[in-house]
């Protein structure tokens, strides 16, 4: 797989060949690939890739606290370029990185403007040894997580709302409750 800021055209062409092969099965395909040039995005579009995941991750105001390699505006510009080419967009965020409730609302307002076809909400799973490994997640209760998902449903009703990372921790076997709010859940890494 590919992830990051810069890829060679050769790497993208290799991925495009794989996409063309998978499309022969009639599968709807989504890639989470990072930043692309317009030329590279067109290569994937011409290979019949349907959707690209490019999460906002956080609000504009909080973004510099979680990322130093690029700006929030660069993410938004990348998404708009992908939409202009014709891709469906999957874009959401991560809850629990230290953002305020206002940041959650602001992120959802940005997503409402983008109008992604799918909006995944991830709940932070701190991993020791990473920059967010010691993050206090005591505020990520089942009730709070459900409120965030409900807010996403109300604020971005045209998008398929998806509960992604953290579902198995924060909903602890209560996933049936999720289905009253979300369109799909991720289980064992799969939608």
Where are the regions a protein language model picked out?
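Conserved Radical SAM active-site core
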Residues: 1-92, 97, 101-114
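Auxiliary Fe-S-binding modules of radical SAM enzymes
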Residues: 24-25, 112-191
């Amino acid at each position: 797989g590919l992830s990051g800021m810069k890829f060679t055209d050769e790497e993208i062409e290799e991925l495009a060949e794989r996409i063309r092969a998978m499309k022969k099965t009639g599968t709807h395909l989504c890639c989470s690939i990072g930043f692309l040039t317009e030329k590279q995005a067109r290569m994937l579009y011409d290979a019949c890739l349907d959707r690209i995941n490019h999460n906002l991750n956080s609000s504009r105001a909080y973004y510099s606290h979680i990322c130093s390699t690029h700006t929030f505006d660069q993410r938004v510009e990348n998404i708009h370029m992908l939409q202009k080419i014709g891709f469906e967009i999957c874009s959401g965020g991560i809850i629990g990185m230290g953002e305020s409730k206002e940041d959650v609302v602001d992120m959802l307002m940005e997503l409402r403007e983008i109008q992604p076809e799918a909006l995944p909400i991830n709940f932070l799973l701190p991993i020791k040894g990473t920059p967010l490994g010691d993050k206090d997640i005591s505020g990520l209760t089942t009730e709070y997580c459900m409120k965030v998902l409900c807010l996403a449903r109300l604020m971005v009703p045209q998008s398929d709302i998806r509960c992604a990372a953290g579902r198995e921790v924060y909903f602890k076997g209560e996933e049936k409750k999720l289905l009253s709010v979300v369109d799909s859940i991720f289980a064992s890494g799969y939608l």
